[in-house]
């Protein structure tokens, strides 16, 4: 397992260094790479991984806590770290999947102003004006910190390499901008997604089912489950293990809640997204 500090936000260097160490420890070809990322530079971390392990599937998520206030830590090789990136190289038969299960609504607009993970304008209008119009709710009702829970069932979706990914609006600001857990950039087309609580639960089974197709006989499951989805599920998150057992049988399971997930919906192209399920099945 490799680990590297994300110094000065240099995710590329951290991803490259940690992946090199993990592959060296494995001593052979990796079937998959399992991430425990640091929230913020995930897209750059994935670029660093791809530089040393092109085409190797990536599965995992970013370390989380009870709230996104920077207290979360990463762990690797018997130690805990802060502001680090950890990655494990795994050999043997594996299957993997990266899904979210949101339905497209057809309500979409082009990003006209954005910086980093903050969206300012959609179609030349305040981002929150467009979003509240789409969901038919007042900004006074769902704005500010309330957005993080409301938007779990109504995220904004982006399309890349023919796949639809989810971005989580986690906060809105007085100027009408919206903060996300994934990068925003001018020219992106964002579309409103939607899902019921029942749908969020069922999608966990779907993700593991898709991952299990990659192996003959599943022997273990690792699921990086979005912490934001857990907010919407509440106590019903306890239904997830039964959903997985119904899907693939009584297979040992390890799961964790992540603040942002990494995975490969397209072979060899790792992507960072939010409100997602990143599943790894060992064969």
Tell what function each PLM region has.
Residues 1-234, 238-251, 256-283:
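Small-residue-enriched flexible segments
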């Amino acid at each position: 397992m490799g680990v590297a500090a994300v110094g000065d936000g240099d995710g590329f260097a951290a991803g490259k260094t940690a992946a090199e160490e993990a592959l060296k420890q494995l001593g052979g070809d990796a079937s998959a790479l399992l991430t425990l990322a640091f929230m913020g530079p995930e897209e750059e971390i994935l670029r660093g991984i791809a530089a040393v392990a092109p085409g190797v599937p990536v599965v995992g998520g970013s370390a989380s806590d009870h709230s996104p206030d920077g207290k979360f830590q990463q762990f690797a090789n018997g130690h805990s770290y802060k502001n680090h990136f950890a990655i494990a190289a795994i050999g043997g038969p594996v299957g993997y999947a990266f899904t979210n299960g949101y339905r497209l609504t057809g309500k979409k607009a082009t990003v006209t102003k954005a910086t980093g993970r903050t969206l300012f304008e959609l179609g030349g209008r305040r981002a929150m004006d467009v979003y509240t119009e789409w969901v038919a709710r007042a900004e006074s009702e769902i704005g500010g910190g309330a957005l993080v829970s409301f938007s779990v069932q109504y995220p904004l979706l982006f399309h890349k390499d023919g796949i639809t990914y989810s971005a989580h609006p986690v906060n809105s600001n007085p100027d009408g901008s919206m903060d996300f857990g994934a990068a925003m950039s001018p020219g992106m087309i964002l579309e409103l997604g939607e899902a019921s609580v029942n749908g969020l639960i069922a999608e966990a089974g779907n993700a593991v089912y898709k991952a299990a197709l990659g192996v003959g006989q599943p022997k273990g499951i690792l699921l990086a489950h979005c912490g934001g989805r857990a907010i919407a599920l509440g106590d019903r998150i306890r239904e997830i293990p039964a959903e997985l057992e119904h899907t693939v049988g009584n297979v040992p399971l390890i799961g964790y809640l992540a603040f942002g997930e990494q995975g490969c919906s397209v072979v060899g192209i790792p992507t960072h997204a939010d409100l997602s399920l990143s599943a790894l099945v060992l064969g």
